[in-house]
Swiss-Prot record:
This is Photosystem II reaction center protein L. Coiled coil: none annotated. It is found in: Plastid, Organellar chromatophore thylakoid membrane. It is a single-pass membrane protein. It comes from the Eukaryota. Disulfide bonds: none annotated. HAMAP family: PSII_PsbL. The keyword Thylakoid applies. NCBIfam families: PRK00753.1. The chain crosses the membrane at residues 18-38. It comes from Paulinella chromatophora. Its main location: plastid. One of the components of the core complex of photosystem II (PSII). PSII is a light-driven water:plastoquinone oxidoreductase that uses light energy to abstract electrons from H(2)O, generating O(2) and a proton gradient subsequently used for ATP formation. It consists of a core antenna complex that captures photons, and an electron transfer chain that converts photonic excitation into a charge separation. This subunit is found at the monomer-monomer interface and is required for correct PSII assembly and/or dimerization. InterPro entries: PSII_PsbL, PSII_PsbL_sf.
């Protein structure tokens, strides 16, 4: 599995960045919805 470290690291980093972007998007939408509902 560690024969090609570079091609295996690129998709992992892309998945990590997409995961962080998804969590950030969910967090921002949650804050916006909470502020919209509480106001």
């Amino acid at each position: 599995m560690q024969r090609n470290p570079n091609p295996n690291n690129l998709p992992v980093e892309l998945n990590r960045t997409s995961l962080y972007l998804g969590l950030l998007l969910v967090f921002v939408t949650g804050v916006l919805f909470s502020s919209y509902f509480f106001n």
